[in-house]
């Protein structure tokens, strides 16, 4: 089974172009399943799963009684342990995807998780930032310092484009056409799209690329955004920096880099951009995913009306 899990993780990385964040989640979820089966005696004990190939220890451990009942029992254990509904749903999705891969590879005859449903999640609307909050956040990095300049540049690109954090991390120099203000993005499932970037963001990118410290540190000739070692920056590094800027800015609420994506989508809609264009810019495969921003926009208008109306 362990060899099959590693084969699945390699498939996600090489064929499906899964992001490092996605791979970590799959590894975490399947490691939990592995430990559960080991504790029940359905699987021989082994080392924890590793994403790095050189750290892997693979022995021939067969699937033993990996049935629908075992998947149900594992999900029940997660619920009993107080895991969040979203975590449980993600974990079940990981198991379903892995089992589906095993069926295709003729390792399993059927998918034991296929008909199992996870907990229902309440519909939560994204909470975008206000224009004022965006300005406060943008002003937080110290642009007189190299890393502050890089982080301001990142924020400008986030807000200009609505890119996912994994897409920004993957951006290369050759993906930018600075003369036409266009950027080529390879999104989920290797889907490619070309989107415009604001003049303001382009100016920040040019300043950042020409900074002497960046040129001195550069060890990855393709990547645009570098870490302190001159290598391509990671999503985790961006998350850490982002949380530090939030702390310094004094902004409250649950705000992440993905919040900026929700924010610009909402601001585009409020400025009159049509849903099909927003869908294309964000790289949504379904218009239904984009439609949620109409609900967010209506919610914000109601809130503003309540706060401003003298008879409210």
Curated annotation (Swiss-Prot):
Keyword match Cell division: yes
A Gene Ontology biological process term: cell division
GO cellular component, one term: cytoplasm
GO MF term (any one): tyrosine-based site-specific recombinase activity
This protein's UniProt keywords: Cell cycle, Cell division, Chromosome partition, Cytoplasm, DNA integration, DNA recombination, DNA-binding
Record has Membrane as a keyword: no
Active site (catalytic residues): 164, 188, 258, 261, 284, 293 (o-(3'-phospho-dna)-tyrosine intermediate)
Gene3D superfamilies (alphabetical): 1.10.150.130, Intergrase catalytic core (1.10.443.10)
One family name in Pfam for this protein: Phage_int_SAM_1
Similarity comment text for this entry: Belongs to the 'phage' integrase family. XerC subfamily.
Oligomer status and interactors: Forms a cyclic heterotetrameric complex composed of two molecules of XerC and two molecules of XerD.
Cited function: Site-specific tyrosine recombinase, which acts by catalyzing the cutting and rejoining of the recombining DNA molecules. The XerC-XerD complex is essential to convert dimers of the bacterial chromosome into monomers to permit their segregation at cell division. It also contributes to the segregational stability of plasmids.
Protein name stated in the entry: Tyrosine recombinase XerC
Organism of derivation: Chlamydia pneumoniae
Taxonomic lineage from the root: Bacteria, Pseudomonadati, Chlamydiota, Chlamydiia, Chlamydiales
